[in-house]
Swiss-Prot record:
<protein>
    <recommendedName>
        <fullName>Methanethiol S-methyltransferase</fullName>
        <ecNumber>2.1.1.334</ecNumber>
    </recommendedName>
</protein>
<feature type="transmembrane region" description="Helical">
    <location>
        <begin position="131"/>
        <end position="151"/>
    </location>
</feature>
<keyword id="KW-0472">Membrane</keyword>
<keyword id="KW-0489">Methyltransferase</keyword>
<dbReference type="GO" id="GO:0016020">
    <property type="term" value="C:membrane"/>
</dbReference>
<dbReference type="GO" id="GO:0032259">
    <property type="term" value="P:methylation"/>
</dbReference>
<dbReference type="InterPro" id="IPR033580">
    <property type="entry name" value="Nurim-like"/>
</dbReference>
<keyword id="KW-0808">Transferase</keyword>
<dbReference type="InterPro" id="IPR054700">
    <property type="entry name" value="MddA"/>
</dbReference>
<dbReference type="GO" id="GO:0008168">
    <property type="term" value="F:methyltransferase activity"/>
</dbReference>
<keyword id="KW-0812">Transmembrane</keyword>
<feature type="transmembrane region" description="Helical">
    <location>
        <begin position="99"/>
        <end position="119"/>
    </location>
</feature>
<feature type="transmembrane region" description="Helical">
    <location>
        <begin position="16"/>
        <end position="36"/>
    </location>
</feature>
<feature type="transmembrane region" description="Helical">
    <location>
        <begin position="191"/>
        <end position="211"/>
    </location>
</feature>
<feature type="transmembrane region" description="Helical">
    <location>
        <begin position="56"/>
        <end position="76"/>
    </location>
</feature>
<keyword id="KW-0949">S-adenosyl-L-methionine</keyword>
<comment type="function">
    <text>Catalyzes the methylation of methanethiol (MeSH) to yield dimethylsulphide (DMS).</text>
</comment>
Length: 255
């Protein structure tokens, strides 16, 4: 009887972890769908470039603070030391899903509390300009999505970890590979994000702040990420760094 109860609890525990991972993933998906409208100024009543309702200084302080909260969460929870401490409190298979969940919540906070600054820097209101900018904006999202699948979408967002735990299979780290986009730049995912952030027919001060802060954050985060990748993959990644540019294809061997 006790053995059956232990097995039952084990199954319930694994089922909970699996459902938790699925919940975190779909929370992330909904956040991304909302981000398309928020950053692209489409479909939503409030977006990145909505009309200003606060003073310039107040809005700037709030917006930079919100982006700082996201950057802090995104960076701290990705550090090896934090993961080691965090997985003492939660099951290790839940770590990636929890990271995805907290990242989604941090983004939701940005969307919710964002204070638009309506000062316009550029405005391409003609049809040709809008088609070009929105096409590049859409291309950015496509590059982001495809890049995640090239390296393993389900591992990146925690589903592989919780599924293997549910199946009582050991997690194995992904092998180093450089498919498709990764043969031309080391970080195509971030190239996609840059297109998403910057390709807008209407650039307000708020949008410029958002794009600038996130771009600076990514450029700093890349340095930390590459140190981790070298630690994991060793000489393979060192050779890759020497042969493939960081962000701009066909310009030198290293950027």
């Amino acid at each position: 009887m006790q053995q059956q109860q232990t097995l039952s609890n084990s199954f319930l525990s694994r089922t909970f972890v699996l459902l938790y991972g699925v919940f975190c993933y779909f929370t992330f998906l909904l956040t991304c769908v909302y981000a398309v409208g928020f950053i692209g100024n489409i479909f939503l009543p409030k977006s990145l470039d909505s009309k200003s309702q606060e003073s310039l200084v107040t809005a700037l302080l709030i917006d930079v603070g919100l982006l700082g909260i996201f950057a802090l969460q995104h960076s701290v929870m990705a550090r090896k030391q934090f993961k080691a401490w965090w997985t003492r409190l939660i099951p290790k298979p839940m770590e990636r899903s929890t990271y995805v969940l907290f990242s989604s919540l941090a983004l939701m906070l940005v969307f919710w509390q964002w204070h638009p600054i309506g000062i316009t820097i550029w405005n391409f209101d003609n049809l040709v300009g809008q088609i070009i900018f929105y096409s590049l904006f859409a291309l950015g999202w496509v590059i982001v999505l495809v890049s995640t699948f090239l390296i393993n979408h389900f591992d990146l967002f925690g589903l592989r970890q919780v599924y293997l735990y549910f199946e009582e299979k050991e997690y194995t780290p992904l092998k180093f590979k450089t498919p498709a986009f990764y043969q031309y730049v080391r970080h195509p995912l971030y190239v996609g994000w840059f297109l998403v952030f910057w390709m807008t027919p209407i650039m307000t001060v708020a949008h410029l702040v958002f794009a600038s802060v996130t771009t600076i954050y990514i450029l700093v985060a890349i340095q930390l990420e590459e140190k981790d990748l070298v630690a994991i993959h060793g000489e393979k990644y060192e050779n890759y760094r020497r042969q493939v540019p960081m962000l701009i294809p066909f310009i030198g061997k290293k950027s």
